[in-house]
Each structure stands twice: as structure tokens, then as C-alpha cells.
């Protein structure tokens, strides 16, 4: 046999599909090897044999899958044939009723099935379910549902069912739904909604519905239910009569904007779980004769038995032919069975559609002029054996039109029934067709594709659809002359993270520029230098973006990082400064010509001065000293992106397309021809002017890349053919005009520089991140807590959903005598500047706990009432997002409230001691919704203060702090006593562990229970963190000499590890020498409480109750502070303050080895940052110094082991040092005290710093990092509005002050690119190129107008945060509307 032919034996009675490159002969599949992929002459025989063996194995695997699947389908078809022959129906979705007459004549319809001709269905989603609401599903029968089942709602439906129960919910039923349903029950109530009632959210609301939910709502509901006020939770009316859940229910109408379910929310769209062509249970309109089966009537759940086929090959060998193109033999044939609606009458011919996939690569050349590639869809179809569209003379007879090409445009399910050429006639259609039809866009939050639906006035002659995002007739000044707008439907399969996903019918590898060669995110591609352009033949359109279809779940939810797409869009009020779109940087109309002239002449000073609101376009230039930011090319185009070059001799495939040079357009864009999706008889070649040069502005629809195209009848446009009605009448002498879909050119531009303009004349902009280190940061939003009346104790953390939890103190009365009269309440504001919660205090000081979502929207509030002397609160979350809060109280009872504002726990007042105050501590656990779980108390007759809390992956809880004077007893959450620690005259450190139920696991201590005061000393545990190496790290200070470390579980056994105090400055207290200069300790414990190692930092460490501190900071704090963070590699980073140098840094064991790293002092008080390895050896150290004081009190790490430190400073200029001693930047202070936040990389290099400042005192008190590596800061400010600055030192946000001290919460994010969006006249898609994603953010701003989201919130810009980040924008005059977004962080004014 010729070596270019391979034989693979197939199974008996199975059918192998073939195309123009494969031939099936006598039970064998013969695969021809392209000549250009023959083994090289220089290959050895062993190499060639190995290659052939790999390919044979690949083919065998693929064929085995195909054979099994095809045989399964044949069995199913044979079964149906036998049933039809016997004139018996099995009542399946594919069966036919014998007659469409009265229901009693059709016995098959008495069972549970989804056949549209059946009137007596007992399951499914039917409008005639009189005993239950139509959108709930059936009221009887144990319906499941399971994927592929006939009954009840399918996955994503609203109902449930509950275990063992009916399909439900129904009147009196238990509370569904399971996850995926639209709303939870009212606490203690049945399943909502009911007519006139609210949706019934879980406490904390609002209800939703979430993506995939059922009811719109139709009307908002704003009354109180069971004492709760659920404003605009809706609905008050039942869902539309048809659907929307189940495979056969489809909502034809769109819920109009403003009806919720959220405040200011836009229209809510129904899920697309399939179309229904007639109402269920209504057979009166059926004609005599067979009921017609309809294409694609089943949902995706029904089609679960039609799996997609794919195979892969590990062979990486390549060969190159003479023309320079290359093909890879690693792309084995993948095929997909897509013709699930094909008539079963033809199955006896054993014809199965088969699409063979290839993978080819194209290398860049140095010819930058050849960057445009035209791809004709017909060439692609020919390659794969598909039929190309044909054009038939309208005068030809109907019989000349192949039936398989005919697809009918519909108008409210009515077509031209009198036309003898009409195929797929609807049995209930009428004789009248619509004269002219437009289709309105339907905003689908569950998919990045656009779905369209017919106008409610479909059979009226209308010019356009009056919808916010409608298919308008004048997007760009051009006119539509067409009867229909395209209808898009979600693809049957969405790409996953794997490039060789079965939903991609063809792939090309295209080598990008060298800027991507340093990509270290190897999880995204086998070859970091490759950029994959997908060509999808499902609907004969081409997908040039490898990222659009990645990382989407089965519900096609683009904002899969968010709980609800519509919950991610929030507005921000303009506070303090007036945001005027007409006169500020973000809304200037800057023409292309003006920008070019300015960029050629502006100097660095002007660039900075004009940067009023923190735009980074010019800031980059100022740092680099460049004056021409955007050099202008010969075509006067602003797109100065590094081009993706494709030479004349390097095409995608010589059999498919030829690459040509188009000199009329931007040389840096890539164009790909697409099939025309508009059904139009005329096409006006009008142009819109984009940035000084003309470019055709397509009046055709803008098709998202990779989106299958369907007609109004939900019939797949498999053959690129559409039928256009030439006349509004339905006279029998008219025949359809069958036309081919004309190719439409899609354009793409690529950006791979740090700063650039986004060209809106191209359809898609693909972004290559140039580097992975972010050196700039911008504020996303800020919110305040008004009338705190104090400036201590605020802490912050984040949970797995990037929600933000803040805890702190507020003072009810600032007068000497407690009084609530005329004292303004503490007010919690959200990021929009709206007061969302008033807190009226009942004591002197109280603890608050506030939870925000990732955009600063208020979720819930809880409080703890008592009297406090040590204003220390700590907060943590576990892996289930439960919230753990700790605090201490003195000589008073404690009242604990949860998010329902109910008193849930009372801790009695300690029995007072006549000689001293008693301070005890507590641990409180709340659920993610703020519902109280349990409390545990640390009981003593002396003092016990918890300073810090953390959790481990098993949801165990660890605390540290100090105790003194008397025995300390640790109580369980049920009130029983557990371990105790012995008494001490002064203070010792305690460490304790609890399980998730609040029961003590072990306790231990650090100190010295000696006979004299000098042996005991003052020792405090200040911070505790869980480490990824399954240990616990504790930091604090001590002046005991020595500090003895004990082991758990009872803290009675010395571990053998101790630390000496280096400082020798002692004072005499009652005859005993006490060391007044403490040392810092670091101790690592195993999770069972046994000590592993300890080390120390020595020097003159600052304690905040000194006279210097009091004069410097007006006595605002008396707390000594040091805090730690653990990075993903288990390294330990510690920060604190010191007032004399040098600081001596010791290594393990037991802090006996002095490291070579020392820090000097500049000014009064400086901040140190020291990094240790997992075993306690110092790696590097750096400092923050200035003429006066710099104090740090918060530290965190991100997913890349970068380090973020927060604090405040009084020096006029504060210098941030890197670990190598360099000083990359400074911050200036123009007030009494300003706050700072600085970021370092893992090596101690300072990357960026920002400040918060007013005319009084501003302090950053704590910092946290969320899962997006965004930075959240909390602090206080007084007397005057607070200004928030970006890292370019431009003020970007301002919040006014309500009282003596207010609190603030601010969220920052850094970025590696600053891109400016230009005005445009057509849809614009922007996406990150996954192969060039550097684990960083890209900033996009718009200056010529505004960007608004679905609820018309005004945005300053947005951040693209992930490898699959993408956004689609629609033009609205001089503004942009966000149509969908995936992994996008919006930036509010």
C-alpha cells in the first residue's frame, strides 16, 4: 500500500463519515496525507514509523468514539421506525401524534411528555396548570427533574424539587428552590413569589432573580413582609403565560426597564431554554393531518445524548512546504454531530454529517505591510466538503429550490401559507404576512452573545424598535433597507480553557510578536508565543478571538466571577466635586488631529497639569521623558500598535484563503471575511468617518465572534442561505428569492504597548499585555462611615466572592456624661454616596461589622454593644465565608446583634473586683449573611485581650493576645470551661485554637511565670496568621528576659525554645528592674500547638504611649503595633515602627544568629518591612522614612507574593526605599497627618504608592487584598473632606466629612497598561489575548464622553483583570453603553 494511504479497520455495522480528504472503501477508512506534510527526506525510518504509529492511534481513538456514538443513534432511529410502523407513539419529544384532532383521540398525549400536540400533559411548564402557577411547573408527580428528563423544569429552572417531593413548588409546599433558582423563601415561609407578593428573598435580600431565574419581574414590589422591607424586589404579577422555564417555554416579550429587581435596574430578560412555536395544550388550531415536527424544538438538556466528538494527538512534528506555510500533525480530526434536526426519513442511507478539523500554523514575517487577511467563507466550506451558497433566479420555479436550502423568515409564527414553495409550514399559520418587520435586541445576561426578539408590534410596519439597545436604523448615519434584523442564539457549546475545545471547528496558530515570549502564565497555552485564531464552522462564521469563548459556564454567564451580572453594575454619586461631563478630562471631545498636534508638542509639565482626574495616558510619558507618546504613521491613523505581520508567502492555508495587502485601511489591523448575516436586498456603501480617515461603517449587524446565526424561526442557518420576501402580500404567484449571504469583512486591531488608543473603527481590539509588573494604581471606589467620633480599631478582610467585611468602633456620645440626645447617628454610606444604614448607639462605644459587595454596595450590618478600654477588634473569614469577630470588654455586659437587628446573645457583666477593672474577651461567629452562629468567652478576674484572629482551611479558628493578673479560662461555645493558663503579675502571651463549632482544641502561652516582676515582664501577642505550610505564625513584643515558649495543648510544658532580650535599658518599678525597650518576636507553631522555631528583631522599637508619640500624633493612640502577612510560598513579612537605629535582625534558631541585614533611622519614627523565609531566616529588609514620623499598621500579600503596606505619616516628604537601598518615589504631605499605601514586589522593590489626605488627620488603619488582587484600605479622617489620589499623584476621588472623625473604605487596583477609548459609531469588542496575559490588569478610560452600564450608571472607565476579560460596547451618540462584560472591574466617579 502506498505510504501516503493509511488503513484503519472499522467495526461491523458502523458507518464512517467521509469528506474530500478521506475515502471509505471496503470497510476501511483511507486517509490521504497531504504532500506538504510527508515525512522529511532526512527523517530516519524509526522517526517515520513512530509518527505513523501516533497518527494511527489517534485515528483509532477518534473512530471508536464515532462508531459508538453513531451506533447508539442508529438504534434509537430504528426503534422509532418500528414504533411508527406499528402506529403507536411512545410520547417522546420526537414522536408524532396520529391526528391533530381532539385530545381524547390521542392516547399518546395522556402521559407526561413534551409533545406540543398533547393537551393533557401532567409535567412540564404549561400555561394551563390551573392549580399551580404556570412558571412553577407541575403540581403532581415525582418529576425529577434530571438532565434529559421529560418532566419539570430543567437545570436553571425556578422550582426545585426538594428531596422526595413533587416537581413543585406549589401552594403549601416546602421552600425551594435549590441553587440555580430565582429566589429563596421568606424566612420561615413558603416559596415565593405569589400574585401580589414579593419575591421572598433570603434575609439581607434583594431577591434576584439570578441568572437563569424565571420571573421578570413584571412590577416592582415595595411593601413590607414579615417586618422586612424589600424595596423593588418584585414581582407583583405572575410570569408570562408561556415559559420561561423548561425546554419548550420561551419568553417572547422583554421585561421593560425600571421594573427591578434591583433599585434602578434595567429590563430583565427571560432565559433562552428553547423556543415554542405554539402554546401548549391548545390543539384547536391544528389542521387535519400530521402534526409537523419543528426544528431545534428541544433544549440543550434534551440534546445531551448528542455529544460532541473530539480527539487529540500528542505528536508535535511539523513539516513545511515550499510556499512557506506550515501545517502541524498534532491536530487530529475532530468532528461534531450538528444536524440534530435532520429528517429521519433519510437515515436509511446512513448519511452522517462529518466535519474534519485541522490545525495549521502561520509564522510572522517581517513584512508589516501585509497585516490584513481576507478569508472567504466559501473557500472554507469547500475545503470541508460543505455546499457553498447559491443564488437562484427569482423567476425559476419552486421545484428548482433544494429543500435543504430553504429557511423561512417568520413573523409571529405566521408565514406565507398559500405559497406552494413554502417549506416547513406551520400548521397554524395564516395567509397574511407582515409588510415590514424589525426585531428588538434582547439583553441576555447569561451569554456574551446578543439575543434578539421580535417586536411586540411585529405585524405592524415599524421603522425601528424603541428599546435602549435596539437594532436601530441609524447607528452610523446609514439606513437599513431590510425586513429583518438578525436573531442570535447562544451556541450549543462554549469554549473552555482548552484551545482544542470541541466547539472550535478549526484552529489556526498564528505567531505573535516577541512581546509575548516572556509570558510566564503557562496555564493558558502549550506555546506562550502562539496566538490562536479560531475558525468556527457551526454557522459559517469565523472566530478570530481565542479568548471570547473561554471560561464560561453552562449558563453562559459572562460575569462568572460575580453573583449576578446585573448586581455588578452600580452607580456612584458625585460627592464634593462636581463631575461635569462638559468640562473635565473624562468628557472632553478631543479630536484626532488635536491629539496628534498636542502629542508632538506637549512637554512633561503640561502633560501632568492637564491630567486632572488621574488619566494615565500622559503620566506614562512624563515618567519616561517622552514627548511623542503616539507617533503618527503615514496613514494618519492613531493605531500605533505593534502589528501582527503576515507575509505574502505565509497564509493560513493555501487551500483556504490568500493573504493580501489592503492599503486603504489601517496596516495594523487584521480583517477576516464573515458571512453576511443581514437579510437585505440592498446594501448602501455609506461611510462613517473615524479619526481623520474614512472606513466603511457596516450597516450589517455586528456579529460577536464565534456566534451561530439563526433565523426568526430558530432554524439553524447551516447552508448560509436565507429567504427574502419581496412583497408584503402572500399571493400565490410570488416565490421566495433565495440569495447567498454576502461575505462581510470583520476587522481586528492588536495593542501590545503600555499606552495606546483603542481604535473604534475595527470590530475587535485584542490586547497583549506588555509586562507583568504593575507600577501604577488607580482608585476604583470609596465609601465612608459617618460620625464614628473616634479613630481607632478599624479592620478589614475579604471573602471568596470578593465581598468586603469591615469592623471597627464608633462612639455614641462625645460628651463627658453619656447622653443620646441630639447626638447624630452613625451613618453607613455605600460607594455611590448614599446613606444606607443609620446606627443609633445605646452605649458609650460600640463595635460595628459592615459587609459590602465588591463594588462597595451595602449588604448587611451587625453590632456589639458594651464598654471598651482596649479598642482592639479583629476580623477573619473562613473557607465558607463565615465571619469571625473578636473583641474585649471591661466591667460591663455585652449585647450581640446580628444582621437582622435582633439581640441574639447577652454576655453578663463580670463580677467586679474591688481593686482593679476586669477585662474579658469574646469570639463571635456569623454566617455569610450575618446570621449569628455562636459565641465563646475568655473568662478571667484580671485582664484578657484578644488582639488578632485567623482561620485555616478546615475552618478552625486561632487567636492570640495577652492576659495578666489572674488565671485565664477558655470557655467553649456552649459555655463550658476548657483549658486554663496560670496567673501572672504582669502580662503573658496566649495562643489558642478552636474548631469550627467553637470548642477549644488547645491553648499555650509565651512568657515567664517567675517569682519576681523582672522575670515576668510585659509580653503581648499582636498578630496571628495561618501559613500555607500548615503552621501558625504569631508576632508580638516582649521585655521578659528570657521569653519562654510553651507547647500545647495546655501550655504547661516548655518547648525548649526561648528568646533573650538584647536591650539593657531598665527602669525600677517597686524594686524590680523592668526593661522599657521591648524586642519583637516571631514564633511558628504547628497546628497542634507545639512550637517549631522563634526569632526576634531588636533595636529601639517604638511604643506609642511615649512623650514623643503623644506630641507627634496628639496622643491619638496608645497601642504598640506590629503586624504580619504570609505569602503563597509561606514566607513571612512583618512590619512595624522604630525610633532609633540600627535595627538588628536575627535568624533562627531562637534568634541567636545576627543577620547581615540592618536598618538605619531617618527622622523621628520610621517603618520597617522585613521578609523571612518559612524557616525564620531573614531574606531582605527595607524602610519608609522621612524628616518626622512614618507609621505602618497594616500589611497584606497578593497571589503573586507582592506585598502591600498601609499606614500614615507626618513628614513633609516621605521616602519609600526598596530593599536594595534605592528610592523610586516619594509622597508629599500638605496636612497634619496623611495616609499612605505602598506596594512592593516579592524582592522588596517598591512599585507604587498612593495617599489619602485632607486638611486635618487621615490615617490608614488596615489593608486587605481580594481574589482579584485589588487592594482594600480602611481608615479614618477628620475635620475636612478626604482626597484620594492615584499613583500618578492626581486626585481621583473626594468624600466630605460628617463629624469629628469619619471612617472610610477605599478600593484600589493597579495595572500595566493605560488605554484610551475613542469615540465610535458601531459595536466595539475588546478582549485580553489569553496567550499574552501577564497576570496583571489593563486600564481603559474614555475622555470624549461617558461610559454607562445597563442601569445607566456613569463610569470613569474599567479594568480588565483576567486572561478571559472581555467587554462589548455599543455606541450611543458620543457615549458608550456596556452591553456585556466578563471579568471587568468598573471604575466609578
Curated annotation (Swiss-Prot):
The entry's keywords: Coiled coil, Repeat, Virion, WD repeat
Q: Which GO terms describe its cellular component?
A: virion component
InterPro entries, per this entry? Motility_Chemotaxis_Reg, Quinoprotein_ADH-like_sf
Residue ranges crossing the lipid bilayer per the database entry: none
User: What compartments host this protein?
Assistant: Virion
WD repeats: which residues? 867-907, 1017-1056, 1115-1156
Provide the protein name: Uncharacterized WD repeat-containing protein L264
Q: What species was this sequence derived from?
A: Acanthamoeba polyphaga mimivirus (APMV)
The lineage is: Viruses, Varidnaviria, Bamfordvirae, Nucleocytoviricota, Megaviricetes
Amino acid at each position: 500500500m502506498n505510504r501516503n494511504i493509511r488503513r484503519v479497520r472499522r467495526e461491523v455495522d458502523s458507518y464512517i463519515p467521509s469528506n474530500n480528504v478521506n475515502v471509505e472503501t471496503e470497510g476501511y477508512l483511507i486517509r490521504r496525507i497531504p504532500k506538504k506534510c510527508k515525512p522529511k527526506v532526512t527523517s530516519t525510518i524509526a522517526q517515520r514509523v513512530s509518527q505513523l504509529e501516533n497518527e494511527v492511534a489517534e485515528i483509532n481513538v477518534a473512530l471508536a468514539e464515532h462508531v459508538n456514538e453513531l451506533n447508539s443513534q442508529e438504534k434509537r432511529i430504528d426503534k422509532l421506525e418500528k414504533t411508527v410502523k406499528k402506529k403507536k407513539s411512545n410520547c417522546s419529544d420526537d414522536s408524532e401524534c396520529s391526528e391533530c384532532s381532539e385530545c381524547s383521540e390521542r392516547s399518546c398525549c395522556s402521559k407526561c411528555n413534551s409533545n406540543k400536540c398533547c393537551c393533557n400533559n401532567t409535567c412540564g411548564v404549561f400555561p394551563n396548570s390551573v392549580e399551580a402557577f404556570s412558571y412553577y411547573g407541575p403540581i403532581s408527580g415525582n418529576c425529577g427533574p434530571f438532565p434529559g428528563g421529560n418532566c419539570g423544569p430543567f437545570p436553571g429552572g425556578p422550582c426545585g424539587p426538594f428531596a422526595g417531593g413533587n416537581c413543585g413548588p406549589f401552594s403549601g409546599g416546602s421552600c425551594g428552590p435549590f441553587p440555580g433558582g430565582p429566589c429563596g423563601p421568606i424566612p420561615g415561609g413558603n416559596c415565593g413569589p405569589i400574585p401580589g407578593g414579593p419575591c421572598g428573598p433570603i434575609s439581607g435580600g434583594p431577591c434576584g432573580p439570578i441568572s437563569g431565574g424565571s420571573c421578570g419581574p413584571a412590577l416592582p414590589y415595595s411593601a413590607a413582609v414579615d417586618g422586612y422591607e424589600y424595596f423593588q424586589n418584585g414581582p407583583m404579577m405572575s410570569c408570562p403565560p408561556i415559559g420561561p422555564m423548561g425546554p419548550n417555554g420561551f419568553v417572547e416579550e422583554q421585561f421593560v426597564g425600571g421594573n427591578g429587581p434591583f433599585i434602578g435596574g434595567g429590563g430583565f430578560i427571560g432565559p433562552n431554554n428553547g423556543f415554542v412555536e405554539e402554546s401548549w395544550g391548545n390543539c384547536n388550531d391544528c389542521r387535519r393531518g400530521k402534526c409537523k415536527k419543528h426544528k431545534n424544538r428541544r433544549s440543550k438538556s434534551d440534546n445531551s445524548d448528542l455529544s460532541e466528538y473530539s480527539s487529540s494527538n500528542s505528536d508535535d512534528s511539523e513539516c513545511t512546504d515550499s510556499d512557506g506555510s506550515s501545517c502541524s500533525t498534532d491536530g487530529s480530526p475532530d468532528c461534531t454531530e450538528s444536524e440534530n434536526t435532520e429528517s429521519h426519513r433519510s437515515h436509511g442511507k446512513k448519511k452522517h454529517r462529518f466535519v474534519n478539523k485541522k490545525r495549521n500554523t502561520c509564522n510572522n514575517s517581517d513584512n508589516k505591510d501585509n497585516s490584513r487577511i481576507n478569508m472567504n467563507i466559501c473557500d472554507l466550506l469547500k475545503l470541508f466538503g460543505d455546499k457553498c451558497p447559491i443564488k437562484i433566479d427569482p423567476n425559476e420555479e419552486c421545484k428548482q429550490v433544494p429543500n435543504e436550502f430553504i429557511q423561512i423568515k417568520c413573523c409571529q409564527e405566521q408565514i406565507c401559507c398559500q405559497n406552494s414553495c413554502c417549506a416547513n409550514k406551520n400548521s397554524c399559520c395564516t395567509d397574511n404576512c407582515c409588510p415590514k418587520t424589525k426585531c428588538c435586541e434582547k439583553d441576555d445576561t447569561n451569554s456574551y452573545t446578543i439575543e434578539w426578539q421580535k417586536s411586540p408590534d411585529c405585524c405592524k410596519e415599524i421603522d425601528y424598535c424603541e428599546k435602549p439597545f435596539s437594532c436601530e436604523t441609524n447607528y452610523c448615519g446609514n439606513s437599513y433597507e431590510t425586513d429583518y434584523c438578525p436573531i442570535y442564539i447562544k451556541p450549543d457549546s462554549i469554549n473552555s480553557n482548552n484551545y482544542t475545545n470541541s466547539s472550535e471547528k478549526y484552529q489556526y496558530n498564528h505567531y505573535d510578536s516577541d512581546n509575548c515570549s516572556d509570558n510566564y502564565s503557562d496555564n493558558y497555552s502549550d506555546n506562550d508565543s502562539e496566538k490562536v485564531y479560531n475558525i468556527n464552522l457551526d454557522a459559517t462564521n469565523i472566530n478570530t478571538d481565542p479568548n471570547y469563548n473561554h471560561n464560561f459556564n453552562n449558563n453562559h454567564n459572562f460575569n462568572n466571577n460575580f453573583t449576578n451580572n446585573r448586581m455588578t453594575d452600580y452607580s456612584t454619586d458625585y460627592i464634593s466635586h462636581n463631575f461635569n461631563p462638559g468640562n473635565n478630562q473624562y468628557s472632553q471631545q478631543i479630536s484626532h488631529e488635536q491629539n496628534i498636534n498636542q502629542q508632538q508638542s506637549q512637554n512633561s509639565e503640561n502633560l501632568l497639569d492637564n491630567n486632572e482626574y488621574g488619566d494615565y495616558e500622559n503620566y506614562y510619558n512624563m515618567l519616561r521623558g517622552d514627548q511623542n507618546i503616539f507617533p503618527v504613521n503615514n496613514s494618519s491613523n492613531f493605531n500605533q500598535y505593534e502589528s501582527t505581520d503576515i507575509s505574502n508567502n505565509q497564509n493560513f492555508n493555501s487551500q483556504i484563503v490568500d493573504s493580501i495587502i489592503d492599503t486603504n485601511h489601517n496596516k495594523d489591523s487584521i480583517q477576516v471575511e464573515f458571512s453576511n448575516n443581514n437579510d437585505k436586498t440592498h446594501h448602501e456603501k455609506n461611510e462613517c468617518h473615524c479619526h481623520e480617515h474614512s472606513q466603511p461603517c457596516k450597516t450589517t449587524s455586528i456579529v460577536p465572534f464565534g456566534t451561530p446565526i439563526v433565523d426568526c424561526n430558530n432554524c439553524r442557518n447551516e447552508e448560509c442561505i436565507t429567504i427574502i420576501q419581496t412583497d408584503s402580500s402572500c399571493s400565490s404567484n410570488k416565490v421566495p428569492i433565495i440569495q447567498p449571504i454576502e461575505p462581510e469583512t470583520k476587522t481586528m486591531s492588536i495593542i501590545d504597548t503600555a499606552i495606546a488608543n483603542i481604535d473604534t473603527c475595527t470590530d475587535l481590539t485584542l490586547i497583549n499585555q506588555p509586562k507583568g509588573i504593575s507600577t501604577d494604581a488607580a482608585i476604583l471606589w470609596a465609601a465612608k462611615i459617618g460620625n464614628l467620633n473616634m479613630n481607632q480599631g478599624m479592620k478589614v478582610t475579604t471573602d471568596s466572592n470578593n465581598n468586603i467585611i469591615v469592623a471597627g468602633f464608633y462612639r455614641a456620645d462625645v460628651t463627658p456624661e453619656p447622653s443620646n440626645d441630639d447626638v447624630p447617628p452613625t451613618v453607613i454610606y455605600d460607594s455611590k454616596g448614599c446613606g444606607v444604614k443609620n446606627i443609633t448607639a445605646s452605649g458609650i462605644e460600640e463595635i460595628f461589622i459592615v459587609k459590602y459587595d465588591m463594588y462597595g454596595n451595602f449588604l448587611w450590618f451587625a453590632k456589639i454593644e458594651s464598654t471598651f478600654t482596649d479598642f482592639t477588634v479583629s476580623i477573619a473569614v473562613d473557607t465558607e465565608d463565615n465571619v469571625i469577630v473578636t473583641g474585649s470588654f471591661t466591667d460591663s455586659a455585652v449585647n450581640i446583634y446580628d444582621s437582622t437587628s435582633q439581640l441574639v446573645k447577652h454576655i453578663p457583666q463580670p463580677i467586679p473586683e474591688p481593686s482593679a477593672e476586669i477585662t474579658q474577651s469574646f469570639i463571635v461567629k456569623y454566617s455569610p449573611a450575618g446570621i449569628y452562629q455562636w459565641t465563646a468567652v475568655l473568662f478571667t478576674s484580671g485582664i484578657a485581650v484578644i488582639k488578632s484572629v485567623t482561620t485555616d482551611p478546615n475552618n478552625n479558628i486561632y487567636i492570640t493576645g495577652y492576659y495578666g493578673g489572674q488565671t485565664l479560662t477558655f470557655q467553649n461555645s456552649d459555655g463550658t470551661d476548657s483549658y486554663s493558663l496560670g496567673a501572672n503579675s504582669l502580662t503573658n502571651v496566649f495562643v489558642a485554637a478552636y474548631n469550627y463549632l467553637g470548642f477549644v482544641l488547645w491553648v499555650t502561652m509565651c512568657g515567664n511565670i517567675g517569682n519576681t516582676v523582672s522575670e515576668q515582664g510585659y509580653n503581648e501577642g499582636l498578630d496571628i496568621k495561618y501559613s500555607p505550610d500548615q503552621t501558625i505564625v504569631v508576632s508580638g513584643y516582649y521585655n521578659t528576659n528570657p521569653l519562654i515558649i510553651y507547647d500545647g495543648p495546655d501550655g504547661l510544658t516548655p518547648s525548649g525554645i526561648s528568646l533573650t532580650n538584647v536591650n539593657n535599658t531598665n527602669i525600677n518599678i517597686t524594686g524590680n528592674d523592668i526593661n522599657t525597650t521591648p524586642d519583637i518576636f516571631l514564633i511558628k507553631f504547628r497546628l497542634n500547638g507545639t512550637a517549631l522555631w522563634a526569632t526576634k528583631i531588636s533595636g529601639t522599637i517604638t511604643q506609642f504611649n511615649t512623650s514623643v508619640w503623644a506630641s507627634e500624633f496628639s496622643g491619638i493612640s496608645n497601642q504598640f503595633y506590629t503586624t504580619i502577612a504570609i505569602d503563597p510560598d509561606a514566607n513571612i513579612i512583618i512590619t512595624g515602627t522604630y525610633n532609633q537605629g540600627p535595627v538588628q535582625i536575627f535568624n533562627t534558631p531562637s534568634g541567636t544568629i545576627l543577620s547581615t541585614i540592618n536598618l538605619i533611622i531617618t527622622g523621628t519614627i520610621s517603618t520597617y518591612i522585613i521578609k523571612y523565609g518559612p524557616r525564620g531566616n531573614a531574606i531582605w529588609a527595607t524602610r519608609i522614612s522621612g524628616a518626622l514620623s512614618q507609621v505602618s499598621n497594616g500589611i497584606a500579600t497578593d497571589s503573586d507574593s507582592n506585598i502591600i503596606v498601609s499606614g500614615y505619616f507626618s513628614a513633609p516628604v516621605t521616602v519609600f526605599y526598596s530593599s536594595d537601598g534605592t528610592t523610586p518615589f516619594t509622597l508629599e504631605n500638605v496636612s497634619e497627618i496623611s495616609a499612605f499605601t505602598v506596594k512592593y514586589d516579592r524582592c522588596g522593590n517598591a512599585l507604587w504608592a498612593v495617599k489619602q489626605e485632607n486638611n486635618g488627620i487621615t490615617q490608614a488603619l488596615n489593608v486587605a487584598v481580594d481574589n482579584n488582587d485589588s487592594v482594600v484600605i480602611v481608615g479614618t479622617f477628620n475635620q475636612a473632606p478626604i482626597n484620594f489620589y492615584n499613583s500618578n499623584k492626581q486626585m481621583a476621588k473626594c468624600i466630605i466629612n460628617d463629624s469629628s472623625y469619619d471612617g472610610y473604605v477605599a478600593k484600589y487596583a493597579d495595572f500595566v497598561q493605560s488605554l484610551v477609548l475613542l469615540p465610535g459609531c458601531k459595536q466595539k469588542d475588546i478582549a485580553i489575548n489569553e496567550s499574552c496575559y501577564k497576570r496583571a490588569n489593563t486600564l481603559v478610560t474614555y475622555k470624549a464622553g461617558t461610559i454607562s452600564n445597563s442601569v445607566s450608571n456613569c463610569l470613569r472607565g474599567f479594568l480588565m483583570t483576567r486572561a478571559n476579560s472581555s467587554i462589548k460596547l455599543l455606541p450611543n451618540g458620543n457615549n458608550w453603553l456596556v452591553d456585556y462584560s466578563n471579568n471587568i472591574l468598573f471604575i466609578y466617579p
